[in-house]
Amino acid sequence: MKLRALFTISSRIARILLLVGTLLVSGAYLLGAYSGYIPPVRWIIPAFLGLFFPALLVAQIGVTIFWLLAWDKRRLLLMAAVWLISLPQLLVYFPISRAEKSLGTEEESLRILSYNVCAFGFKPHTKTSPNATLQYIKSSGADIVCIQEAMLNQNPWAGVVSKTLRSYLDEDYPYINVIRVNRGGSTLALLSKYPIKEAKEIPLPSWVNGAVAYKVDIRGKETLVINVHLESFRLRRVDGEDYLRLAKDGDAIRLKDALRAKLSPTFRSHNIQANIIHDLIQSYGSGRVIVCGDFNDTPLSYARYKIGEGLEDAF
């Protein structure tokens, strides 16, 4: 009797532990899925869960498979509820390509290209050795091209210079605007087939990153185009090596502290920068708005959610 009672108690403890583990995994998974709704300046943990969402997704799949094999109907109902709740965010993270919907004729359509060119690969452009990035942009067929990190070199043998950029692309894009934001930091450029009526830097708190708002006359209609390059995490190879070493050593506390110290300031910067851009969009009223660029964040991030609030995702 004592042995049977002990077995019963052990079984109950195991079930409780499994339930607690399931709730912890599912809770973290849902918090990561909806992390974009929580400002990092108020609570930073959801931002980290959103960043590591793929790992949480794998864990949630594992928990679901376990309860399928155990065939516990109550736990399976819980899993079904979790998947149903997270479905909208899964479609944000993994957008499904549906049949192309035509919103008008070919003449009415607008093709946008957003490209972080990383200083055009620091490679020059000549007739005998053309720059691959410039070639891609020229052949893209885009009506408007938003470029981030469009740093132009002073030496034509060390990279793309302003004169080369304009002369090579002028036939396709007669309207070109290049602005170095935040005291000469990252360079943002807009190449357009339509007249650029105004270009103004958006004052974002950052050392090198930034954003620019353009008013473009597209077929007689003014459109606000915002080219965004949000704060970078500035992760170096040595950082990755340190994190990997801490993970291998099983030093979870030091790994957590290292990640928090490195990533938290950027998450908070994204929060502030996204709010500024959101307010600008709202102040524009009911006019046409296009936002694109390098957000340096995930599709589930607060930055993506806040900037995109009230807009339609093109993906």
Label for each model-derived stretch:
Residues 2-106:
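N-terminal membrane-anchoring alpha-helices
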Residues 12, 23, 30, 37, ...:
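Enzyme catalytic cores with a strong preference for nitrogen-chemistry domains
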Residues 44, 128, 132, 272, ...:
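Short, conserved clusters of charged catalytic residues that mark active-site
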Residues 48, 190, 313:
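Conserved beta-strand positions that form and line the central face of beta-propeller blades
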Residues 69-70, 138, 282-285:
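Residue-level signal for alpha-helix termini/capping positions
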Residues 77, 83-109, 119, 124-126, ...:
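Structured beta-strand-rich core segments of catalytic domains in phosphoester-bond hydrolases
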Residues 112-113, 146, 291:
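Residue-level marker for buried hydrophobic side chains located in beta-strands
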Residues 238-315:
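Metal-dependent phosphoesterases centered on the DNase I-like endonuclease/exonuclease/phosphatase
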